[in-house]
């Protein structure tokens, strides 16, 4: 029997919605990264974009363990002396709290062209509203998967 290798006609993308309220950031990011890559499917093919479209809501209510809210995110503007930093707490309280989840998922994917393509299938919203009701997404309950996924 030959090893199965998927073709574009074999790929079936679903829409999945995940509520991030009270869920630990790293555990959520690893589940989302697995879904984006398509590794949960038995027909997984490493060089194809087989993953589902994932919608994450309530990104501003994400939880972190320990003192991770005080850890810094660093970036460089490209200009001399342009190193910038902000704590995760400042980002979550700012205008774009979904960037914390976006960065965590991005860093759990391999750094290649395919993962950049797969990141376009991820949509993150700070609040509970999202414009994807027409796609009728399935609810994936991350909280009930494992008791360690939540933090009170």
UniProtKB/Swiss-Prot annotation:
Instruction: Kindly give the InterPro entries that the UniProt entry links to this protein.
Output: Ribosomal_uL13, Ribosomal_uL13_bac-type, Ribosomal_uL13_CS, Ribosomal_uL13_sf
- Which keywords fit this entry according to its UniProt record? Ribonucleoprotein, Ribosomal protein
User: Which Pfam families does the entry mention?
Assistant: Ribosomal_L13
Tagged with keyword Ribosomal protein: yes
Q: Mind listing the GO biological process terms from this record? A: negative regulation of translation; translation
Q: Which GO terms describe its cellular component?
A: cytosolic large ribosomal subunit
Q: Residues annotated as region Disordered?
A: 129-152
Its Gene Ontology molecular function terms?
A: mRNA binding; structural constituent of ribosome
Is this entry keyworded Oxidoreductase?
A: no
Q: Which domain of life is it from?
A: Bacteria
Q: Which family does it belong to?
A: Belongs to the universal ribosomal protein uL13 family.
- Provide the function of this protein: This protein is one of the early assembly proteins of the 50S ribosomal subunit, although it is not seen to bind rRNA by itself. It is important during the early stages of 50S assembly.
User: Subunit composition?
Assistant: Part of the 50S ribosomal subunit.
Q: What is this protein called?
A: Large ribosomal subunit protein uL13
Organism equals: Ruegeria sp. (strain TM1040)
